[in-house]
UniProtKB/Swiss-Prot annotation:
Subunit organization: The complex is composed of two ATP-binding proteins (PstB), two transmembrane proteins (PstC and PstA) and a solute-binding protein (PstS).
Keywords from the named record: ATP-binding, Cell membrane, Membrane, Nucleotide-binding, Phosphate transport, Translocase, Transport
Enzyme Commission designation: 7.3.2.1
Biased composition (Basic and acidic residues): 1-12
Lineage start: Bacteria, Bacillati, Mycoplasmatota, Mollicutes, Entomoplasmatales
A GO cellular-component term linked to this record: plasma membrane
GO biological process: phosphate ion transmembrane transport
Region Disordered, residue ranges: 1-27
PANTHER family registered for this protein in UniProt: ABC TRANSPORTER I FAMILY MEMBER 17 (PTHR43423:SF1)
Catalytic activity, as annotated: phosphate(out) + ATP + H2O = ADP + 2 phosphate(in) + H(+)
A Pfam family this chain is assigned to: ABC_tran
Protein name: Phosphate import ATP-binding protein PstB
Main subcellular localisation: membrane
Amino acid sequence: MSNTLKKDETFKGLDLNKNQKEEKPAKLPALSKRADVIKVSDFNFFYKGKKQALFNINMEIKENSITTFIGPSGCGKSTLLRSINRMNDLISGSSVEGSIEVFNEEIYKQGTDVSKLRTEVGMVFQKANPFPLSIYENVVYGPKTQGVKSKKILDQICEDSLRKAALWEEVKDKLETPALGLSGGQQQRLCIARAIAMHPKILLMDEPTSALDPIATLKVEELVLELKKEYTIVMVTHSLQQATRISDMTAYFLKGELIEYNTTKKIFINPKDSRTEDYISGRYGD
């Protein structure tokens, strides 16, 4: 399979005549009735020299849900997050055991199209990282690399993505200005728009608000709650308050192990493991 997606595969079905004020998706079914879109089975991750970072991780993540990974620094939560779209492949000497399935496809099997995987599973990093290009070129950069040349289609992708990232109204009159001139919160929402522009099905977010002020953090959280209607979201956060505000499910990690995974309400109100209780009550810090 080619590592370059044809534009008809990723961007097919675009309606260039549609009203940009799209109807909101129907109300989501109960969490228990949603399909599993990510399944992690007996997953182990090793850095160079066989230094083990994750130990026998098992979990399933539902579609159109927000799952937060919490735990002290170095507990493995970001390592697992980056394993879901194989970003850790970029770490020299790393290796894995076990499996991760995304939409019932084992992503670590030989012959996996990693480029296609990373299109379907987008990534938003801790620090906003807009390219030193215009706002417009930041958003359409990915589609262009996948072969989209039509200005009309690129314009639509740009507007749709910025609208979904709750940024369109703030930047629609300055799309050709440098993205680096935006505020920190706007830059992070631009990076979310850039990820959305690739038409992913899953969004991975690695502490996306850690560098933002409280107002910008609130805007991103409101955006994430809205995006859940269309995407499955997995987020690493150091903020327990953030986890309680936005997530459906929470996973607590400690020293590379998944200690407890349950609905966010149960994790924070009635944890089953004393180590989880120690962490959320502040008796075990970072």
